Amino acid sequence: MRSEEIRPATAADVPAVKAVTDAAYTPYVERIGRAPLPMGADHAANVAAGKVYVTGDPAGGAVAGLVVVEAFADHLFLDSIAVRPDARGSGVGRRLLHFVEAHARALGLPEVRLYTHVLMWENQKIYPRYGYELVGRRVDGPYERLHYRKRLD
């Protein structure tokens, strides 16, 4: 896979999807006191449903990042974004966020929505830089989440 390519994940990608997701979210386990939901996702089912898109490493062809998205009538939900720790700072996350927005536009959807755990401070700095606005804070079971949206032009 070329580094700038973003493509639908295939069944052959499932082990890499799990590995990248686990590597990206493991640092948060201790901070939030439990595994973030993406770590327990049914990656094979998400891939089979066409919800997962992967991209390569700028230094090679292995999966370096991914997004899990789901289309609804009025928005595209960004369920998860994960970048392999050794690929952080290389533009992988930026490319994935731009892809999500382009994908929403291609589907004719007016906005992207997502949430992040309140203790994932890093994300609270990243999303506003890309035009996402905080629209709410909710407790969903054991997870306290900040909800964001980005309206697309």
Residue map of PLM features:
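Short glycine-rich hinge loops at helix-strand junctions in the catalytic core
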Residues: 91, 131
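A generic secondary-structure micro-motif detector
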Residues: 32-33, 90, 113
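Acetyl-CoA-dependent GNAT
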Residues: 4, 8-80, 84-86, 97-99, ...
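Active-site acidic-Proline motif in GNAT/NAT acetyltransferases
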Residues: 84-86, 90, 118-119
